[in-house]
Design a protein with these regions (language model features):
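ABC ATPase C-loop
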Residues: 174-175
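Conserved structural motif at the start of ABC-family nucleotide-binding domains
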Residues: 27, 42-44
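ABC ATPase NBD coupling module
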Residues: 77, 89-105, 110, 133-134, ...
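Conserved ABC ATPase signature
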Residues: 157-161
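The feature captures the beta-strand-to-loop junction immediately N-terminal to the Walker
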Residues: 58-60
């Protein structure tokens, strides 16, 4: 089906998108029109994503991939349409409210580690939405035990990490946070192959933990 739409140059309709998901739909976007300022970039956009499903947005620069992520998280103006998590409408919630109430986390394309905080402290920042700090410490320890590169520098400031190690740290925070929806913009950009493998291993771990 994907090849058919690629050849014809047509976008799939909502009914066809639903066929690609299970009956357990977690994220729903219906007839979304969104953009920046007064400029509308997304037009009547639909999306359905099941629980524990991984979805990759592919397209040329300027196609609107980041705008879709920004709209889900709350960085754009929503002109019409709605976004739901498990049937709960979250269209007009702020990013902080989406993180707290329904567990939407966003890993930006640009580096977002805290350079003067230690590697371990950066990991623990991923658990600030949890009620029990003990659980956050336990999850952070699991990450450190699994990834030697982070474990060996757990007490050092994050600014000493290489670009690949910083990206690994950013995405590892999601293992501590345990979001219901994780948005990742360009997860492997600028990374060496060894780090790309680690990043996608983390994303697989998150998917299997659902």
């Amino acid at each position: 089906m994907s090849n058919q739409y690629e050849v014809l140059g047509k976008a799939p309709v909502a009914g066809d998108l639903k066929k690609l998901t299970s009956s357990d739909i977690h994220l729903t976007i219906k007839n979304l029109n969104a953009g920046y300022g007064k400029m509308e970039i997304l037009h009547n956009f639909d999306l359905f994503v099941s629980k524990a499903q991984s979805l990759c947005l592919i397209g040329p620069n300027g196609a609107g991939k980041s705008t879709i992520l920004h709209s889900i998280y709350g960085f754009t103006n929503i002109f019409s349409g709605k976004i739901e998590i498990n049937g709960k409408e979250i269209t007009n919630l702020t990013p902080a409210e989406k993180l707290k109430s329904v567990g939407i986390a966003y890993i930006l394309q640009d580096n977002s580690v805290f350079p003067d905080m230690t590697v371990e402290e950066n990991l623990l920042m991923g658990g600030f939405i949890k009620d029990k700090s003990e659980e956050s410490f336990a999850e952070a320890e699991k990450v450190l035990q699994k990834y030697e590169r982070l474990r060996n520098r757990r007490g050092q400031p994050a600014k000493v990490l290489s670009g690949g190690e910083r990206r690994l740290l950013e995405i590892s925070r999601a293992l501590v946070m345990k979001p219901s929806v994780l948005l990742v913009d360009e997860p492997s950009i600028g990374l060496e192959p060894k780090y790309i493998d680690m990043v996608f291993e983390i994303l697989r771990d998150l998917q299997q933990n659902e």
